[in-house]
Design a protein with these regions (language model features):
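Auxiliary alpha/beta "docking" domains used to position bulky ligands
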Residues: 2-188
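Short alpha-helical interface patches
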Residues: 35-47, 139-143, 147, 212-220, ...
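A short small-residue
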Residues: 98-99, 221-225
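Residue-level signal for pocket-adjacent positions within structured domains
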Residues: 154, 168, 210, 264, ...
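Short, intrinsically disordered, charge-biased short linear motifs at domain edges
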Residues: 173-186, 199-204, 225-236
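SIR2/sirtuin NAD+-dependent deacylase catalytic core
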Residues: 191
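Iron-sulfur cluster-binding cysteine motifs and their immediate structural context
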Residues: 194-217, 223-224, 234-261
Length: 291
């Protein structure tokens, strides 16, 4: 296929090839080689023990943090899915019920996977190589996010975008085709520290760095015994904690509701057998099942 230079803007290219970008998805690109490398940043967190006992991208930082993974790749397409539009922010639950954090209400990686498969199918027809990374321990998913112009890293350590805030998940697709990198944009949290103020355990006391040893979300996914000082802060949370997300001003584009949040009956959960529990919440990260 003969491609004119102006078509190498990825959005123009997809439009010309009748590939629709789904609702709530934003995309951008970076050139490869990118010379982007976050390996040392990951190692620093690990050396300071702030990763707690998480594996994931900490298992092999030299690879997961490396931007230029493939000599054949000419670009990486970054896909951001805004799941914040699906459910409004709620802040209450009923007595005897357990709250599920907004990021875990559903498997929000599904739309990213579906769109990336569509892109891969297209590039396959051109005999162009691709490699995707979606929620993978082999790739630091936010590696190219800032360089692509989609947003910035907030003081909560989450990736933020204007009007979306932290309510997004990220996928990456390396492609054997050269797309132009957008002009760099300058974003910042400025003097805002709402995420730090809202964190119930002080896991964000050092801005831009999360101490997983204090993070409720980490402990609710850990097979270890939860420390007493964390237990007293968990309250009625069943899975996850998103206080740092709900407090983030760029993500507050909807009214906060006092209605019940997504919740589960804790008594039923306790009496549910393993197979039914996994079936009901198959997208949850469960230690020893997911590795």
């Amino acid at each position: 296929m003969l491609i004119k230079m102006k078509d190498l803007n990825v959005i123009n290219y997809l439009n010309k090839n009748n590939i629709a970008i789904p609702k709530n998805i934003k995309i951008s690109t970076v050139d490869i080689p990118s010379y982007e490398n976050k390996s040392q940043r990951i190692k620093d967190v690990k050396d300071q023990q702030k990763h707690a006992n998480m594996k994931f991208t900490f298992s092999n930082p030299d690879y997961s943090g490396l931007g230029d993974k493939f000599t054949w790749a000419e670009s990486c397409i970054i896909i951001s899915y805004n799941y914040g539009e699906i459910y409004s922010t709620n802040i209450s639950t009923s007595i005897g019920k357990g709250a599920i954090a907004r990021f875990a209400i559903d498997d929000y990686y599904k739309p990213i996977k579906k769109f990336i498969e569509k892109l891969k199918d297209h590039f396959d027809t051109l005999d162009l190589r691709t490699q995707e990374f979606i929620d993978s321990p082999s790739h630091y998913d936010r590696l190219f996010f800032e360089g692509s112009g989609l947003g910035w890293q907030g003081k909560s350590s989450m990736m933020l975008s204007p009007s979306i805030g932290p309510w997004q998940l990220i996928g990456n697709l390396y492609v054997e085709m050269k797309f132009e990198t957008p002009v760099a944009k300058s974003y910042s949290c400025g003097n805002c520290n709402m995420c730090q103020i809202s964190c119930p355990t002080g896991a964000l006391d050092n801005e831009y760095k999360i101490d997983s040893r204090k993070c409720i979300s980490y402990w609710l996914q850990s097979p270890e015994i939860i420390p007493h000082e964390i237990r007293t802060k968990i309250a009625n949370r069943f899975y996850g904690c998103d206080d740092c997300l709900t407090s983030c001003p760029p993500g507050q584009n909807k009214f906060i509701s006092l209605k019940k949040t997504k919740e589960v009956d804790l008594e039923k959960i306790i009496n549910m057998d393993k197979d039914n529990l996994i079936s009901k919440f198959e997208w949850f990260y469960v230690p020893k099942r997911n590795g």
